Amino acid sequence: MSFSRSAADAADTLPDLAATLGAPAERAFVTLGDAFHTRLPAAPLAAPYVVGFSDDVAQLLDLPPSIAAQPGFAELFAGNPTRDWPAHAMPYASVYSGHQFGVWAGQLGDGRALTIGELPGTDGRRYELQLKGGGRTPYSRMGDGRAVLRSSIREFLCSEAMHHLGIPTTRALTVIGSDQPVVREEIETAAVVTRVSESFVRFGHFEHFFSNDRPDLLRQLADHVIDRFYPACRDADDPYLALLEAATLRTADLVAQWQAVGFCHGVMNTDNMSILGVTIDYGPFGFVDAFDANHICNHSDTSGRYAYRMQPRIAHWNCYCLAQALLPLIGLQHGIADDDARAERAVDDAQAVLAKFPERFGPALERAMRAKLGLELEREGDAELANKLLETMHASHADFTLTFRRLAQISKHDASRDAPVRDLFIDREAFDAWANLYRARLSEETRDDAARAVAMNRANPKYVLRNHLAEVAIRRAKEKDFSEVERLAQILRRPFDEQPEHEAYAALPPDWAGSLEVSCSS
């Protein structure tokens, strides 16, 4: 269905939007059957109101930007449609399992997320819409099924910020707030964020059917993912091994991009890993400020399992979990009669695929770091040069984002221009030593300083969603002032542009930012 962009038509759209979202032919995941999900209505928020709205996502879904101002919009995306959910359009929560902090957690599932259907995108793809905070489900365990305003604003802002950084991610259409109280570490208010993605299938979905010894359902799920998202795998000698390889390589690429911008996910459990290799489940995430390779963004991660430097290793480990779940399917087409022989070959084939993770991740990160350093030519010592910079940053706790952004000001021939970036380092002699190595490397490049600076500023964002910026927006939103949410969203749409009128948003964090803590208690 295509939506016009007039305000009048936007108003006409809303009464039928729930039915449109839930049209059976448009909900491929639902057609897999009851073993994969539970249908139930959302538990609507009381007196909902719009906190944030993404024009970009609306445009992607061919929705008029004016739709957010229409009566009924907040109600629909708070889980309360303008009329009862049609039987065929009832939202659903999916079931999955997974490893949490490295320990098998058993059955999990969408404990507070309800998928309300699909819409066609203007890019030719189809997108699922999911209400995070839509109420209790059979998979809520001890939870209340709610999300709170602070975490919903953070996810809304970061989903869109990551997209504009060029990093694969789920998107966010809107945040709906309410004065409805929710008990966490303190009394907060409830909210719902509407997530948008081609699919919300996770590694944990495969683990669930593997752990329950349901190879038939495991194969059904894998076929769905292959046919809809990885059609090239169908033509491979072993489609399920090809699926594992595709997901593994996408995951390696994704984490390389995280590392390159200093992004920490915070909760890289297998149930928080997308089979499409996109960033999903924004919880206690954070962008590194003062660089520490051991930075832990999640206050609940007392062991540092998901620290910045650990993310590549954990992503690789998670791919092993996915491989284990897919083992019953790998090699089926080879016609090996002996089950033990087939299983042994499946393990060997899976291990060969998993060995490709570091082979993919290393070069991907090297390419990203070479771009961040403004190096066009590939030289053997480039990775060592980048690592030496990170070590020097780590020792001085130099700001990650500002360091890389200001490197563009370094001149091949004039060390006096180093001051803006040099001043970020406590040990300036150590920086000088690195800068001399860098200048020597730049002498091998053909671009002049100006051309290199332009290229570097396209690789090094000036603006990222620092925790203190999100915190200011959240505090104002709690007072019903949503202007800072909108302002931040607009700034983060153009992370690589100078935007001199917003210079304060690119500054070093204030002292009070060091006391901010984010955890899993959203």
From Swiss-Prot:
Pfam families reported in the protein's UniProt record: SelO (PF02696)
Disulfide-bond pairs as recorded: none
Active site location: D271
This protein's record includes keyword Metal-binding: yes
Molecular-function GO terms, alphabetical: AMPylase activity; ATP binding; magnesium ion binding
Binding site for ATP: G109, G111, R112, K132, D144, G145, R195, R202, D281
The keyword Cell division appears for this protein: no
Keywords, comma-separated and alphabetical: ATP-binding, Magnesium, Manganese, Metal-binding, Nucleotide-binding, Nucleotidyltransferase, Transferase
Binding site for Mg(2+): N272, D281
Catalytic activity from the UniProt record: L-seryl-[protein] + ATP = 3-O-(5'-adenylyl)-L-seryl-[protein] + diphosphate; L-threonyl-[protein] + ATP = 3-O-(5'-adenylyl)-L-threonyl-[protein] + diphosphate; L-tyrosyl-[protein] + ATP = O-(5'-adenylyl)-L-tyrosyl-[protein] + diphosphate; L-histidyl-[protein] + UTP = N(tele)-(5'-uridylyl)-L-histidyl-[protein] + diphosphate
Enzyme's top EC category: transferase
Cofactor entry: Mg(2+); Mn(2+)
EC number: 2.7.7.-, 2.7.7.108
Family of this protein: Belongs to the SELO family.
UniProt cross-references to NCBIfam families, sorted A to Z: PRK00029.1 (NF000658)
Functional description taken from the UniProt entry: Nucleotidyltransferase involved in the post-translational modification of proteins. It can catalyze the addition of adenosine monophosphate (AMP) or uridine monophosphate (UMP) to a protein, resulting in modifications known as AMPylation and UMPylation.
Designated name of the protein: Protein nucleotidyltransferase YdiU
Organism of provenance: Burkholderia cenocepacia (strain HI2424)
Organism phylogeny: Bacteria, Pseudomonadati, Pseudomonadota, Betaproteobacteria, Burkholderiales
